[in-house]
């Protein structure tokens, strides 16, 4: 419910009487509560196995969860939910989606029982003007979300919802759409983009999967350029990644793992600080580089 709708709603209430209990009113106004501005994250989520391993990347996810104050909710834009149109999950209890194959049975047994937040989903729907946002009751939490958030909030005490990636639209479109989510930072919502900056599965060196900081030359070159643009605030170069040459073409053969980075960067305010963590490559053609945007 947006502010205009809320005011109209109040006008319909009896001036006296008990048509609405106080806790019900609080529930409706809760999305309007303002807090100190939350950080924004882009997380290089890597292999689903990170959900059950305890490696340096997992330790990085855990540490960033400890460094920032606990949010009222998490909104995640995951590489693994592409749709025709834009949707936000709006169920009370999102299911844990095991959207992968060929991994140990232990991984398929993992459940992340975080609640959803239908009220937040409705607020997002009503406040985004760039496109119509649908409320989705079928998806849940895919591994781009739960495999990293479970390390940040292992007790699953923070509600989590997802916003889908509309595969029909351009990087510029996604960047502009993300800007419409800015107000959520002041309402206690932690916004996370989850993907990988360099992500070319076809060129993975399967013999060196466990060798951290191993990358092909083209992957290193693309990664260094990306980091330069990120830290300098030159977002337009990142939006126009398809014009950046062969290294970027190899690093981003398909856009779904890259677009969540643009969502995070679009949410950066002028006076915010920005830093990198988990800044290493794996398997030759993947990077785990993650981004943290914070108030100064």
What is the predicted role of each segment?
Residues 126, 130, 158-159, 169, ...:
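Surface-exposed, charge/polar-rich loops and edge strands
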Residues 107-115, 137, 164-171, 248:
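Flexible, glycine/proline-enriched loop segments at strand-loop-helix junctions
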Residues 121-175, 180:
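Internal, conserved structured core segments that host functional sites
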Residues 57-67, 172-187:
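Long, well-ordered alpha-helical scaffolding segments within enzyme catalytic domains
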Residues 21, 25-132:
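A short aromatic-anchored loop/beta-hairpin motif
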